[in-house]
A protein has these predicted regions:
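Left-handed beta-helix
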Residues: 58, 63-64, 69-70, 77-78, ...
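Short, charged N-terminal helix-start/capping segments
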Residues: 1-21, 62-85
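Extended, positively charged loop/linker patches that create polyanion-binding surfaces
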Residues: 120-122
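A short acidic, helix-capping loop that chelates divalent metal ions and anchors anionic groups
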Residues: 115-118
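Terminal amphipathic alpha-helical/low-complexity segments used for targeting or macromolecular assembly
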Residues: 1-54, 58, 132
């Protein structure tokens, strides 16, 4: 097995999908309005997510402390629920269908590293969650997973 040498880390062909100005503006908008626990107003959160490129259907319920890394890589269907402390770490696309519940503390993780390379490159893949699925509290969804319609993922 190849020995990992972290100083040689290489992002490979990874793209954040936005320029540095957009990324910086999102960082502050997210911290002040979307991720902020003081803001109970879903309309403000939805406004900023759409402003930064998220495709959002009607009826989104987004609770406090929901962290979304790159809204421009996010598609949400109709009547999606995002519970408290959910984290969408979307280095790649995340597509969530209609009537999907992402419960408290769930982690959607589209990125990882290739430990077989000394450069520890990213190994990213999209996540697709089909209509009617439920991602239970504290559940981790890994890169490349496709959650089928009306499936239930839980910890345990």
């Amino acid at each position: 097995m190849t020995e990992v040498f972290l100083p040689s880390f290489n992002t490979g062909n990874f793209s954040k999908g936005a320029g540095i100005i957009k990324q910086t503006l999102w960082y502050f908008a997210n911290a002040l309005f979307v991720l902020a626990s003081w803001n109970p107003f879903m309309g403000i959160k939805i406004f900023f997510l759409r402003l930064f490129g998220a495709k959002i259907g009607k009826g989104l319920v987004i609770k406090n402390n929901v962290n979304i890394k790159f809204p421009w890589k996010l598609t949400l269907g109709n009547h999606v629920w995002l519970g408290e402390n959910a984290w969408i770490d979307n280095l790649d696309e995340v597509i969530i269908g209609n009537n999907v519940c992402i419960s408290q503390g769930a982690l959607l993780l589209t990125g990882n590293h290739d430990y077989t390379l000394s450069t520890f490159n990213y190994r990213n893949a999209p996540i697709i969650i089909e209509d009617g699925a439920w991602i239970g509290a504290k559940t981790v969804v890994c890169p490349g997973v496709k959650v089928k319609s009306h499936a239930i993922l839980t910890v345990g």
